[in-house]
Amino acid sequence: MDAIHPVSLRNSKRHPLLHSERNLSRRAVSPSISRSFFQHSNGSFPLFQNHRKSLPSAIYKSVDPYVDANPLDPLAAAKASFADFPEQDDSQSSTSPLSSKYHTKKNKQIFVEDSRRGGAASNAAAIAAKKSGYYERTSTRKRSLTVPTPRTSFPHHPRSRRFSLKNAAIATSYHKFKPLSSNSLSSSGMHFSASKQAFNSPLLQTFSPSPSVSPFSNPAVEKLKTSASKQAAEAQSLREFDFFTPTPEPSDKNLEKLKNGASKQASESQSLKNMESLSLARSSPILTSEKLKNGASKQAIESPPFRASEPLPSSNIIPNPAMERLKNGASKLAIESQPFKSAEPLSSAIPLPNPMSEKMRNGASKQAIMAQSSKINPLPPLTASISDPSFEKLKNTASKQAIESQSLMNSGPELLEPSISDPMLEKMKTDAGKQTVESLSLKSSDATIPKPSVSDLGVEKLKNDASKCAVESQSLMINDPSVSSTSFYNPNMEKLKNGAIKQAIEHQALNAAILNKTQLPYFHQSSSELPISASKRAALSQQTESASKSSSNISEMCDSHPPSNFSISASQQASKDRFSEATSSIDLDLSPGRSLSLASSKLSVKEAGARVYNRSVATPVMTPSNPFEISKSASQLASIAQVPVSEPAKTSEVNLKKSLSLASSKLSFQEAGTSLKEKTANVQHSPEVLNDRSLASLSASRHADAISSKSKQHTEIAQPAFNTTGTVLMKTKSNLSDSALSTPQHSDSVLFDITSKAARLASTCAKTDLHRKPRRKHKSFTLENYFGHNAEDESPQSDEVESQTPPSGYSENDIGGTDIYPFALQGAALAAAKDFSRREASLSDSQSAASMDMLPMKKKLSHSSASSTRSIKSLLTNANQKHIHSSINETDDIPTMAAHIVATGQKNKEKAPSFSNDQALDHLLGSAHKRIPSNKTEWSSSSLHIPSHNSFSDIHHRKIAAHAAAITAASEKLTPSIEETSYSSSKAHDASLSAATLVANKDKLIHAPTPQVLAPVLPKVSLPHRHSVSLGQIRGESEVEGDVFYDAPSDKEDLGSSNAPLDVPHGANRSSMDEVNGSKYDYSDGILDGSGQYTDSDMSDDENSLKDSQSSVLSFSAVPTKVLKFKLRDVLGSEYSPSPQLLASSSDVSGSSSAVRAAMKADKIFPAVHENPPPLKTKQSIAKPSPHTLRVPQKKHKHFYHRDDGKYKSGTNLRKSETVDLPQFFIDENRRKLYEGLWAANKGYLLSKSEYSKPNDLICNIVVRELWSRSGAPTSVLAKIYDLVDRHHTGVLGRDEFIVGMFLIDQYLKGRKLPLKVPDSVWLSSKRMGDMLWRLEKLQKKTDNKKPFFKKKKKKRKHLKKFFDFNTTAKVNEGAMTD
C-alpha cells in the first residue's frame, strides 16, 4: 500500500504529495505508512531516526501531552505527539521504519504504555487538522475524517505519533498559507523529492544550534525540474516551522530560466562584481530576477548593479558595439545607456591562457576570447587594442543608430589607447549605418602608433547577441587592475564552427611566439598575401634570427611524438604554405599539435594538393619503427608516387615516411590517379619502390571505390585510380628483379595479397547499384579500344603505361550513359586472360584475325561465341605451335594468381577451405597447369613464383583463370551458402598434386598422347538429369530496375538446395567421409579418390558418354564438382548461349546481376571449353489400349445442312458457345471483396505523408512482397506479376493494381499462363461496380456482333419471288404453245 495522508480521497489529486492516489484504500487515515513513502530516495527520513535525541532537552520536558495539548491547536497537538516518542538506541534505530523489529512479539510489550498516549495525541492532531480547515469537502460525495485507529497487527506501533506530527505540520502550513491556491505546492506539481526537502528543512533549521544563519542564502541553486515551485515551497516551509528564530526574507523569490538576454546580462555582471570586485560590491545581495514580462520592471532590476558600483571615469568608457534587438524599447535604451568599465592592459608576466580548453558552442565567447587575447599578449612597449571586426546586420535601425552615435561620442581624440580597427565590416543594409561605422574605423585608427591589431577575416553571425555582450563585459571586468591576478576562464567554450575564429587564435599564438621566442617561428609570406597589419610584419621580421636559433629545439620536440602523428591534414599543410618559414634552415615537419590549422575550405584543400609535392621533396622526416604503421589512406599513398625516384635506396624509405595527406576531395583523388599514372611511365624502380607504388594504387582504388559506391557523380573520380591500379600491378611484376624476389621480405606473397585484394575490391564495386542500370549503346566501343592493343600484334606492349582506357567517346560526366560494362569487373576477369586472348587470336588465320578487329562489336562477339564451341581436341592440336609462347612473359602470372585465389573462396573467409592461400594456390596451379618448372625446383608455399614454360597449360591456364573469377562471382551471387569441402592436408592427396610428382613424371606428360594430357588431373563429372528454368531467364525477369523481389529467399528453392549435392535423390543424405589417409571421399552416390578421379556409382548410359570430355572448368575448384556444376550449368552451359545482340545492346544483361554479366562476358570474349549436355530423354508415348479389352471410341456423327453459298456447315459447331471463359478474364464480386479486404488491412503501412499525398490509398512494395510471397509462387513469377500491374512505377500499388495482382497469382496457381498484358476486362472488373459494368459491356458487344437475320430472309424471299415469277411465265408460255 502506498502512502496514506489525512486528506479526503475525493480531493487527493490536488495534493502534490499524493502521487499514488490510485492505490489508496478507503480508510482516510492509517497508522501504518508504506515503505515507499519513507524510502522514496533510497533512505528514510532523517526526521524519524533518533528523534528523541535530536530534540533539545528543554523542549522535551516542557511539553506535556496531557495538559498542554489543545485539540483545537494543531501545533500544540503536533508538539505533544512528537514529545511522546519513546527513546531509541542507535542499535534499535533502523533505516526502515517497517523493520522486522516491530513485528516480533518480544518488542510488543515495550510500546504498550506509550501507545495510549500516542493514540490520544494522534487523534488530537487529526481533529485539530480537521477543524483548522485543512480538509475539503465536495458536494457530490462527502468524506469525513475518522479518528485513526491502529492496526490489529501492530497495536502498539509508534509510527502513529510520528505521522500525527507530520499531519499537524502540514495542516498548520496549509491553514495559514492557503495550500490549494494557484501559487501553492499543488499548482506546480512538485516531485516527491522536493516535498521531502521542504519537510526536512524547517525542522532542521528550527532545532539547529545557529538560528541566525539561513541555509538558503546560497544563490547557486542546482537546476531542478521546476525551480520556481521548489523555491516557493522552501520559502513557505521556512516561514511556517521556524518556531524560535525569525526567518529572514528570502533573497530569491521565483527563479526561472531567463529567456531574455538583457536580464541575463544584468545578473551575470552583478554576480561577477559581487564575487571579484571591491568589498562594497561583495556585500551587496545577489539579485536573481524572475521572468520579466514588462520592460519597465526589467529596467528597474538592471539598474541596481550599476548604481551600487562606483562612478567610472569618462576616459575609460568603451561602447558595447553589438546589442541584440530587444523586445522592449525602454529596456533596450536603459541597457545601452549603462557604461561598462574598461580593462587596462595586464602585465606580460601573466601566463598565456589556453583559449581552446573547451569546445565553444556560443559564438559570443569567441569574440570575447579575441578581445581578451589582444589584451593578454601585447608587445612590451605597446598597448593592446580591442578590435571588433564585424558588425552583424542589425534588424532594428533605431537601436543601430543609437549604438553608433554612442560609439562616436565615446571615441574622441583623447581615447587613443583602446582604438578600434575594423578591416572587414560586414555589408549593411542601411547605407547610413554603414557610412557611420566606416567613419568610426577611420577616426579611431591611427597610423602613427605602431601597434599590432588582431585582424579577423570574417566572423560568422552570432546567434545570441545578448550572451555575446555579456561575455564581452565579463572579460572587460575581469581584466580590471584591481583583480589583475585573476586568470581568464570561460566556462561556456565550445567547438569552433568557423575557420575565421581559428585564424584569430593563430594570430594570438603569433603574438605569444614574438614575446616568448620559443613558439612556432615558421610564419612568413609576402606582404601582399599575409593578412596582417604592416606593423606586425615588421615585428615578425625582427624575430627571424631568434626563430632560427630555436629550430633545433623544435626538432627535438618532434622526436617524442609517435609515427601515427605524421598524418598531417591538408589544412595543416595549407597553413604551412600560407605562413611559410622565415629561413630555409627551419624544419617543416612539426607535430600536429604544433601545427596551426586553417579552415577546411576548398581553397586550402586545393592549395594543399598542389603544393604537397614540392614540400615533401625538400623536407626530411624522422624514421618510424615500422613503415606500415603510417595510415595508408588513398591520398597518402598516392603522394608517394608523385615523388620522382632518383635514389631508390634512400628515397623509397623517405616516401613512406613522408606521407603528408591530401584532402579526401574530388580534386585530390583525381590528381592522385593522374599523377600516379604519369609517374609510373618510363621510370626504372627498385623492388621496394614498386611495392610501395602497388600499395599506393591499391589503396587509391579502395577509396575511389568507396566514393563511387556512394554517388553517381563520383564515378569519374574512381576511374583514373582503377585504371592506374591495373597498370601498376601489371608493371610491378615485370620490373622486379630475381634477386629481390629471392628475399623473403620482397616475396611474391605480398604481391599476391595485393592482387587478390584488388580483384575483390573490383568485384565489390561491380555489384553496386550504380552499374546495374541499363546503359545506352555506344557506337565507338570496340575491342581494340577496350584491350588497348591490336589482335595481330604478338609482341608485348611497350613500356608505356597500359591502362584500361575507356572508349574514345567516353566522357567522365556521362559514365552511366555508355554501353560499357564496369571496369572494375573487367579488371577482375579480363586482366587475368588479357594476354591469352591476344595470343589465342593468332591461332586462327592472320587475315581473319585482322579482319575481326575491324568488325563492329556485335560481329566480334558472334565470332568469339562461335569460337567458344571449339572442343579440347582442337586446342590440343594447336598446342605445339611455338610462336604462341614466344612472347609470353611473367606479367600475366599476377592477375592469373589473383583470379585463382578469388576462385578458391578467398572472399568468404568463414566458408573457405581450411588450407591457406598459398597452399590453395599451389594446389590449384598443380591441378590446373601440370606445368614443369624450368629450374627443376619444387614449389613451396613461401615462394610461389611460376616460371614460364612452353606448354599448352600456359594458354589453358589463363583461360581457366578468367572463367574461375567469373564462376566464383556467379557462385557467390547465386549460392552464398554453398558448403565448401575442406580438404584435409593428407599425404596421398598432396603427393599427387605436388610439384615433385610432376617433375618425376615430366617425360610421361610431355610425350603422352594428346587426349591423355589432362586425364590424371581432371575429374570425371556426371551431369544431373534435372531440367530447371535457366538462370538467365530467372534473373532477367527479377532483376529489373526497382525490383523488390531481387535476391528473395525463395530463389534458393528455384535453384535447389545448396547444402547437399543437387543430383542426389530426395531422402538421401550426403555423407562426406574424409578418411585420415585421404584416399577416398564418399559423396553417397559417387567416389572422389585422391588423384582427383570422380566415379559415379549410378551413371546412366548418357552420362557415360561424357567421359571423353574432361576439360571442365569446375574441376579446379575446391567446392564439390556436382554442386557447382548444377549451380552454374545455366550460366556457362551451351544450352543457354545468349545472342550477340543481347550482350551488345540488350538491357537484360545490364539489368541482371554482375555475376551473370561477368560469366557471359568471359564466355563470349574468352572462349572456354564446355561440355555438351546429355541428350534429353524423349517423352514416352502413352500406350494405346488393347483392342481386345476396350472398345474403340466412336466419333460423334456431325450433322450438316445446306447453306446458301453451296457449302455445308456442321450443326455441332453452331451449337458451341462463342463466349470466353468468365473467371479467366473477369474478377467476380466475391473474389474482388476478398482481395479488397486484404488491401484495406495493409494500406498505408510504412508510408509517410511527406512522400505521398494520399498514403492511405496505397500499399508499399515491401508489404506487397511479404503478402504475395505467402502464396508459394516462385519469385520470378511474382516479379513478373508485379511488373504487369505496376503502371505508375512509384514503388507503391493502388487498390486496383493490388487486386489485379492477387487475381493473377490465383490464376497462375490454378495452372493458367500469365498474359503478356492485363486485359481491359480485368481492370474493369477490379472496380467496385465492375460486375455491372462488365456485363453491360458484354451485352453491348453481343448486340454489335449479332447478324441481321431479317436481311437474309428478305434476300431469300426475293430469290423465291424471282423463281416463282419465272415458273409462272414458263407455265403461261407452255399453255400458250399448247393452245
Swiss-Prot record:
Residues 770-780 have a biased composition (Basic residues). Disulfide bonds: none annotated. It comes from the Eukaryota. The keyword Lipid metabolism applies. Residues 262-287, 562-573 have a biased composition (Polar residues). Residues 541-555 have a biased composition (Low complexity). CDD domains: EH. GO terms for molecular function: calcium ion binding. Residues 1-25, 138-159, 240-314, 337-370, 534-573, 768-816, 1047-1110, 1168-1208 are annotated as: Disordered. Residues 1240-1329 form the EH domain. InterPro entries: EF-hand-dom_pair (IPR011992), EF_hand_dom (IPR002048), EH_dom (IPR000261). One of its GO terms (cellular component) is cytosol. SUPFAM superfamilies: EF-hand. SMART domains: EH. Residues 250-259 have a biased composition (Basic and acidic residues). One of its GO terms (biological process) is lipid metabolic process. Positive regulator of phosphatidylinositol 4,5-bisphosphate turnover and negatively regulates signaling through the cell integrity pathway. Involved in rDNA silencing. Belongs to the IRS4 family. This is Increased rDNA silencing protein 4 homolog. It comes from Schizosaccharomyces pombe (strain 972 / ATCC 24843) (Fission yeast).
